[in-house]
């Protein structure tokens, strides 16, 4: 098992979500490119054969779709692990962790949501990270 801090553990979902969105964007970009490859706009009739470039692009698109699906499944699995951990933290500490690491809000947004100052929210966050680290130690999860 990988050794990580509480913060690294919690931030895993943000990275996995970013990767899934990146795969989705690439899939959509390639889908758009296939459309432009397969349409000839010269007004002349053409056969129904699929060109080699279009066929290759379609195969790449299928591969991209699989990578996107795998990335989304990974993000959902990690999200659930992080969510389950955060659910064990009560009070404002749990709320701050939820907004930061599940809803992926920025600190400014969290300050507004929970009516805390910038310094106050970071103080709560430090306490929350300590609680997560204590929980990781109790559960036998490796931390540094």
Regions found by a protein language model. Name each.
Residues 103-120:
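Helix-turn-helix DNA-binding module
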Residues 78-81, 89-93, 124:
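N-terminal positioning helix adjacent to the helix-turn-helix/winged-helix DNA-binding module
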Residues 121-135:
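DNA major-groove recognition helices of helix-turn-helix
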Residues 14-17, 26, 93, 110, ...:
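A general secondary-structure boundary signal
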Residues 1-85, 134-144:
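N-terminal interaction/assembly modules
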Residues 116-119, 131, 142-143:
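Juxtamembrane/interface motifs at transmembrane-helix termini
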Residues 89-105:
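Short amphipathic alpha helix immediately N-terminal
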């Amino acid at each position: 098992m990988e050794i990580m801090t509480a913060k690294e553990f919690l931030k895993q979902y943000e990275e996995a979500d970013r990767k899934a969105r990146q795969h989705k964007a690439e899939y959509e970009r390639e889908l758009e490119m296939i459309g432009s490859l397969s349409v000839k706009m010269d007004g002349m009739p053409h056969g129904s054969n699929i060109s080699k470039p279009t066929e290759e692009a379609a195969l790449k698109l299928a591969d991209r779709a699989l990578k996107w699906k795998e990335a989304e499944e990974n993000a959902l699995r990690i999200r659930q692990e992080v969510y389950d951990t955060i659910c064990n933290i009560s009070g404002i500490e749990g709320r701050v962790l939820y907004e930061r690491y599940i809803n992926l809000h920025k600190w400014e947004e969290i300050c507004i949501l929970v009516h805390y100052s910038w310094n106050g929210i970071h103080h709560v966050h430090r306490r929350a990270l300590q609680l997560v680290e204590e929980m990781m130690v109790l559960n036998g999860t490796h931390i540094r």
